[in-house]
Amino acid sequence: MYTMKKGKDMAKEEQETAAIEPLSPVSQLFVSPSLYCFIIFTLGFQTRCNPSTIVEGVKNTWIKLPRFSSKVEIKKNGKASWVPVSVRVEDHVVVPDLDYSNIENPDQFIEDYTSKLANTPMDMSRPLWELHLLNIKTSNAESLAIGKFHHSLGDGMSLISLLLASSRKTSDPDALPTTAATRKHASSNKKSWWLVGRFWFMIRIIFTTVVELFKYLLTLCFMRDTKTPLMGKTGDAIRSRKVIHRIVSFDDVKLVKNNMDMKVNDVLLGMTQAGLSRYLSRKYDEDMVVEKKKNLEKIRLRGTVFVNLRADTKLEDLANMMAKGSKCRWGNFVGVIIFPLWVRSEDDPLEYVRRAKSTMDIKKLSIESLICYGLIKLTRKILGGKVVETLVRRLFDHTTLTFSNVMGPDEDISFFDHPMSYVAASALGGPQALIIHYVTYVNKIVINLAVDTSVIRDPHLLCDDLVESLDIIKLAAMEKGVHKMEV
């Protein structure tokens, strides 16, 4: 049985959260019409799906959370609040009546089903989540659960924690999944150099933050990315969304990480830069635009990267995450940084990873994401929500794509007694034509693309370029490792 807290403790918490609660500043942005954001996720199972078991599990976990049993009510002044309502789980868990025997290509069917779900508006008059269960065998799973959550419910860390709270170890059905904690800003300075090192570190943080905030201001005012086949027009609404994913080996990413002494995020950003470079180079070849290909290295192409602002990124038990004072806060506690992408042809594929690490090291010295989060709250309080929406909209209008990486479970888990094979997820919304998400699960990493098909008509080709770029980078890293051993 999957439960959270019981008895008096649970009753007390329900009383405390039963009142109407205002949305957080970031959640307010996600419900605005111009930045309407939601998350599409897919859980692949190793067995056939039992809908009644999942419905019972949802009743014992998800519905205990105030946000999953509340609707969003927007007042005339634009302020939104969570309003508790009674929830019938069966209305949110959908089991479509399909003739699976007539489905010739299950993988294509799931892709179309997911994309259709992404293009269907959510019913704002009820809690903003739904879960679709399909007993269809694909190349990577025996059955699937496809969910759609409004982004106001929580960020990637919150929803991964919800997944873990709904799961148990496959090796030990009574044990909750565990993951390693990631501490930030650990210091190894010796005491004798502590003051000098600390002072110099603070100077670097202040200088880097000022520079990055100045670039942020320029972007909000007028600095826009170069027009490329990846970028939509300013002010355009997304016409039609398509969601696709591809599963690759996480071990390949770890091999590059270890051989180059990098972080996983550095490798993923490096392969993204390499993949985008390949895609744009081919596009300019096809269009016979010689001048544009020559100027490929002069392109300004930037991504908005969501940064988790929690001090401790351990995926804690969901009940602890909801508790006041928890180190790991539930909800949308994220900041946004602007990440310049290295887009050009390189003879050495490892240069893409080195450039990614170099840029990320600078970003790690800056606290722009935390300051911007605070400025959103302050601006909303002083000038109102419309001003914040306009500024954030301009940020996404003036950049090309969004990138994020979410570390999932590092061991096999069962979701309400269903052993899982993979997790895929994409956040959609806003004016950008391309959103790239990476989600890890044990020894797999899932590349997720959400695109505006009126701008990017061949998302599978772009996905191929990302996969091939990882292969090329891996081979180069292996060769580098061999040279190191010889030396």
Swiss-Prot record:
One of its GO terms (biological process) is triglyceride biosynthetic process. The chain crosses the membrane at residues 194-214. The active site is at residue 151. Residues 215-487 are lumenal. Mostly expressed in flowers and siliques. It is an enzyme of class 2 (transferase). This is Wax ester synthase/diacylglycerol acyltransferase 3. It comes from Arabidopsis thaliana.
